[in-house]
Curated annotation (Swiss-Prot):
Biological source species: Sus scrofa (Pig)
Record lineage: Eukaryota, Metazoa, Chordata, Craniata, Vertebrata
InterPro entries recorded: Cyt_b/b6_C (IPR005798), Cyt_b/b6_C_sf (IPR036150), Cyt_b/b6_N (IPR005797), Cytb/b6-like_sf (IPR027387), Cytochrome_b (IPR030689), Cytochrome_b_C_euk/bac (IPR048260), Cytochrome_b_N_euk/bac (IPR048259), Di-haem_cyt_TM (IPR016174)
Cellular component, GO annotation: membrane; mitochondrial inner membrane; respiratory chain complex III
Binding locations of heme b b566: H97, H196
Entry protein name: Cytochrome b
Annotated keywords: Electron transport, Heme, Iron, Membrane, Metal-binding, Mitochondrion, Mitochondrion inner membrane, Respiratory chain, Transmembrane, Transmembrane helix, Transport, Ubiquinone
Location of the protein in the cell: Mitochondrion inner membrane
Role played: Component of the ubiquinol-cytochrome c reductase complex (complex III or cytochrome b-c1 complex) that is part of the mitochondrial respiratory chain. The b-c1 complex mediates electron transfer from ubiquinol to cytochrome c. Contributes to the generation of a proton gradient across the mitochondrial membrane that is then used for ATP synthesis.
Subunit structure: The cytochrome bc1 complex contains 11 subunits: 3 respiratory subunits (MT-CYB, CYC1 and UQCRFS1), 2 core proteins (UQCRC1 and UQCRC2) and 6 low-molecular weight proteins (UQCRH/QCR6, UQCRB/QCR7, UQCRQ/QCR8, UQCR10/QCR9, UQCR11/QCR10 and a cleavage product of UQCRFS1). This cytochrome bc1 complex then forms a dimer.
Chief place where the protein resides: mitochondrion
GO MF, any single term: ubiquinol-cytochrome-c reductase activity
Length: 379
């Protein structure tokens, strides 16, 4: 008799994806982050669901309802801070996951990579809308500033902004629709993640060497299920330390002040995970130019397979490219720092240099370095 997990139509799908899946025998801990992202997504949907039971998406009561969750709902503060800091963990895992893809040449799986870029955009949109919901000062002004960027689009810009706002400013209609979108998008993300996985399982996983591992596979369970559980425990430990010891470490104190359209905060800035893109946006004096640079900073990922000039897939045996990769990481950390600083000297010039370096490394230096390394192989 055949095992039920191999014969049952539904169990068969799960079996082929998580149990009997042939996986390379040498994938390192950098491959843990896909499963961690799945765990983050489930955590966010569950905590978000319980928050939505008590939240009201009305400008007059939104802020009070969040306060009510923290003060009066049983363990409401845990749910709220798990959700807020869970988003930070989500983005940490996302950035590492994308970084791993860049380092080891995983972008050569075109369909998987492109769906991944779409996922990144969708998660960023969801996080932005979620930040608006508590209706604090930074929620309101963040929403105003970011949605206003669309007015830079020629001809249709102003109409587009007012259409998104549902009026002539960020108000009740905006908050209600942002809540609706924030609720539905995680389910769209789940569907996209399933497609992401589907395309990945068509080709099989990449591995640190970048060489085909068809001749050396091991079953996903128990080897990588155990490895993923260990990674998940580490992540939950960090998340719980954040939630239970310093839940507001990554937040903005301004968001504990109710939204006031008549009073602009001195420094409007998004959550930490958007600061690198915000710094690129601010480093260009022209509004439309800034918006284009902002979009390009993420969309540039789609170009990665076309910019790949090396004969080797990953960077494991390419020391020059490794140096450039870590320069890029340092540059992104610098941009994140600059995004949180006021617009004044010396931060303006540092931001502009870091923005130029970001595009220069990806578009020019990396492809040229790969060609140099190809020639060094001949010696």
């Amino acid at each position: 008799m055949t095992n039920i997990r191999k014969s049952h139509p539904l169990m068969k799908i799960i079996n082929n994806a998580f149990i009997d899946l042939p996986a390379p025998s040498n994938i390192s801990s950098w491959w843990n982050f896909g499963s961690l992202l799945g765990i983050c997504l489930i955590l966010q949907i569950l905590t978000g669901l319980f928050l939505a039971m008590h939240y009201t998406s009305d400008t007059t009561t939104a802020f009070s309802s969040v306060t009510h969750i923290c003060r009066d709902v049983n363990y409401g503060w845990v749910i709220r801070y798990l959700h807020a800091n869970g988003a930070s963990m989500f983005f940490i895992c996302l950035f590492i996951h994308v970084g791993r893809g860049l380092y080891y040449g995983s972008y050569m799986f075109l369909e998987t990579w492109n769906i991944g870029v779409v996922l990144l955009f969708t998660v960023m949109a969801t996080a932005f809308m979620g930040y608006v919901l508590p209706w604090g000062q930074m929620s309101f002004w963040g929403a105003t500033v970011i949605t206003n960027l669309l007015s830079a689009i020629p001809y249709i810009g102003t109409d587009l902004v007012e259409w998104i706002w549902g009026g002539f400013s960020v108000d009740k209609a905006t908050l209600t629709r942002f809540f609706a979108f924030h609720f539905i998008l995680p389910f769209i993300i789940t569907a996209l993640a399933a497609v992401h996985l589907l395309f990945l399982h068509e080709t099989g996983s990449n591995n640190p060497t970048g060489i085909s591992s068809d001749m050396d596979k091991i079953p996903f369970h128990p080897y990588y299920t155990i490895k993923d559980i260990l990674g998940a425990l580490f992540m939950m430990l960090i998340l719980l330390i954040l939630v239970l010891f310093s839940p507001d470490l990554l937040g903005d104190p301004d968001n504990y002040t109710p939204a006031n359209p008549l009073n602009t905060p001195p420094h409007i800035k998004p959550e930490w995970y958007f600061l690198f893109a915000y710094a690129i946006l601010r480093s260009i004096p022209n509004k439309l130019g800034g918006v284009l640079a902002l979009v390009a900073s993420i969309l540039i990922l789609i170009l990665m397979p076309m910019l790949h000039t090396s004969k080797q897939r990953g960077m494991m045996f390419r020391p020059l490219s490794q140096c450039l990769f870590w320069m890029l990481v340092a540059d992104l950390i610098t941009l994140t720092w600059i995004g949180g600083q006021p617009v004044e000297h010396p931060f303006i010039i540092i931001g502009q240099l870091a923005s130029i370096l970001y595009f220069l490394i990806i578009l020019v230096l990396m492809p040229i370095t790969s060609i140099i390394e190809n020639n060094l192989l001949k010696w």
